[in-house]
A protein has these predicted regions:
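Active-site neighborhoods and metal-handling regions in enzymes and metal-associated proteins
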Residues: 1-168
Length: 168
């Protein structure tokens, strides 16, 4: 559902189009955001539902991030993907960002947390990306969102400025 190459298919009105834009920015630092748009600007009810789940996922997880919070505690409290979306999840909920995608890499935990290393904690001035892909197994569409932040002593400073779609 994600990480697909382009084809010769013409994008039509009502199609979802997602961009994951890893870019080298000023002084060689990486900028990384993901957005999903609908061609023609009008979301279907199903697209709106998926987009709402994706924004809820990002909002919930970013509110958990505080200086000193362990990656394990974050993973334990993180937003739980719906069962019908779990096997389509993106490889991580959070990754570091600097000159490229970097540590930490916080995966979606399995039930006993044996699938990844959750040692470490959020530190002041870490730059991270909080991301999600919401798409049902067997579904035709999905929503990919990602924002970039700096961890501060007072919470998060959002580094990405491109707004999320306003669903009406």
């Amino acid at each position: 559902p994600w990480l697909q190459e382009c084809s010769n298919r013409v994008i039509e009105s009502g199609d979802l189009v997602a961009f994951d834009t890893d870019m080298v920015g000023p002084y060689g630092y990486c900028a990384d955001i993901s957005r999903t748009f609908v061609e023609g600007g009008k979301f279907s009810d199903e697209q709106r539902r998926l987009y709402s789940l994706a924004t809820e996922h990002i909002q919930h997880n970013k509110e958990l991030i505080k200086t000193g919070t362990s990656f394990r505690e974050f993973a334990e409290k993180s937003w739980v993907l719906p069962d019908n979306c779990y096997h389509n999840h993106y490889p991580c909920m959070i990754h570091g960002i600097g000159l490229c995608d970097e540590w930490p890499f916080i995966a979606y935990p399995n039930k006993d947390f044996s699938n990844a290393d959750f040692s470490g904690h959020f530190e002041e001035n870490m730059t991270i990306c909080v991301e999600t892909y919401i798409g049902e197994v067997g579904g035709k569409e999905g929503v990919k969102l990602e924002d970039q932040y700096r961890v501060t002593s007072n919470g998060l400073e959002q580094l990405s400025s491109f707004p999320l779609e306003q669903l009406t």
